[in-house]
Regions:
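Activation segment signature within eukaryotic-like protein kinase domains
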Residues: 140-141
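Catalytic-loop of the protein kinase fold
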Residues: 152-170
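Conserved N-terminal boundary motif of the eukaryotic protein kinase catalytic domain
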Residues: 34-45
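ATP-binding glycine-rich loop module of kinase domains
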Residues: 59-81
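Conserved N-lobe ATP-binding subsite of Hanks-type protein kinase domains
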Residues: 53
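Structural motif in protein kinase domains
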Residues: 116-126
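Activation segment/activation loop of eukaryotic-type protein kinase catalytic domains
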Residues: 169-205
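Short beta-strand micro-motifs within the conserved protein kinase catalytic domain, predominantly
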Residues: 98-109
Length: 417
């Protein structure tokens, strides 16, 4: 058993390896291998922020491109463990990123997942008029509402529905809209379908631009709030703006209060002016939902389908960006040192402190919930570590068993001879 443990420890040390090479511009490139299954180059950085870094990697066996997220354990509000748990529950559904591997390493946690395309905010900004056509908006509405329905059916609410949190897929999934970023996602009921209790006095959680009126009022979020946020997002897609987009305030609290007042002032028929009446009907319905009430998703999907039919629109997946040849999914390789990447990973020295400069899209989270997330993530991280240890010991035992069987067969062959 001691030899098994030693070999298991040896395998752990080889879970991640690296080598350095120079590219044509003489820039140092770190190549990091993960469990001999995946690898990524330090130059293939897709993005990053306060949560960590994301790289484009590759599956060494299938040569399939993947996304590799790296998160420091020292960040204030960790996300990867929480996100991986939710995505694993949704792994069999369309429009949710597939998770291939979650593994801890010293001061970082690594998650390997499906590589996706641009988010809807970037696609909107790349469009000629900084807005989408009615056709694209309605096709998006149907897919996004379907994602929200699936999420809710799995007892979760997203709590941060906005354009940046939906992306297009790649290759054969290019017509699929994916829901991403589950940092604020929470369960609204348990396995016995007991709904979370109604509460007041909550701080705004999510992004103020798309937050529901109930969220602004400090009421605990439920399914209805995700749906109201979707409505604001659809208005934004069609018009390229929201009436409260340029609201300013001396403090966050003053600004958010002004945004709430603007939302209360804008009745659905005024907010949806110039759009099909189905948008107006959508808002009237979702704003009247009760805290624990289950939304009629098929009714809402029917509204969007009805709007398409009345406007002679076919759901043929010919989105606006398909016509724009300038849109691509190039990597973003900015502001990140490639020097000794592997040693920095081991030591947890990567700078995870980049801030989002778009203040109007600032994400908020209740302080009490930060502590809840941290405690929950500690438990889940220990589960992942223990699971990895058990898997390694199990693999080693299988190897030893196979080796014993081979030796037995060999000895029998010798005896027969």
């Amino acid at each position: 058993m001691e030899s098994t443990q030693k070999e298991s420890e040896k395998e752990t040390n080889n879970d991640i390896s690296n080598k350095t090479e120079k590219n044509t511009s003489q820039q140092k490139v770190e190549i990091v291998k993960i469990k001999n299954q995946y690898s990524f180059k330090s130059t293939d950085r897709l993005g990053g922020g306060s949560f960590g870094q994301i790289y484009k990697g590759i599956n060494l066996k299938t040569k399939e491109e993947v996304a590799i997220k790296i998160e420091s354990k020292n960040i204030e509000t960790p996300q990867l463990i929480h996100e991986s748990k939710i995505l694993k529950a949704l792994n069999d559904n369309d429009g949710f990123p597939k998770v291939y591997l979650v593994t801890p390493l010293d001061d970082v946690l690594i998650m390997v997942m499906e590589l996706l395309g641009e988010n809807l905010q970037k696609l909107l900004m790349n469009s000629p008029h900084k807005k989408f056509t009615l056709k694209t908006t309605l096709m998006l509405a149907i897919q996004i509402l379907s994602r929200i329905k699936t999420l809710h059916e799995n007892n979760y609410i997203h709590r941060d529905i906005k354009p940046e949190n939906f992306t297009i897929g790649l290759k054969k999934y290019k017509n699929t809209i994916y829901m991403i970023d589950y940092g604020l996602t929470r369960k609204f009921c348990d396995s016995r379908k007991n709904h979370i209790p109604y509460k007041e006095g909550k701080h705004l959680t999510g992004t103020a631009l798309y937050a529901s009126i109930y969220t602004h009022k400090g009421i605990e979020q439920s399914r209805r709030d995700d749906l109201e946020s979707l409505g604001y997002m659809m208005i934004y897609f069609c018009k390229g703006e929201l009436p409260w987009m340029n609201v300013k305030g001396k403090t966050k609290e003053i600004k958010y209060k002004k945004i709430m007042e603007k939302k209360l002032e804008m009745k659905p028929d005024i907010l949806c002016q110039g759009l099909p009446d189905e948008f107006n009907q959508y808002f009237k319905y979702v704003r009247e939902l009760q805290f624990t009430e289950e939304p009629k998703y098929d009714f809402l999907l029917g509204l969007f389908n009805s709007a398409m039919k009345k406007n002679n629109i076919k759901n043929d997946f010919k989105f606006d960006w398909c016509q724009n040849s300038g849109i691509n999914n190039q990597n973003i390789n900015d502001k990140f040192s490639t020097e000794s990447l592997f040693s920095k990973l081991k030591l947890g020295e990567i700078n995870f402190g980049e801030k989002n400069e778009k203040k109007e899209n600032e994400i908020n989270i209740d302080k009490k919930e930060k502590n809840e997330i941290q405690n929950e993530n500690k438990e889940q991280k220990n589960d992942i570590i223990n699971e990895n240890k058990e898997n390694k010991v199990s693999e080693q035992l299988k190897k030893e068993e196979n080796s014993i069987n081979e030796n037995t067969i060999h000895e029998n062959d010798i005896e027969q001879k």
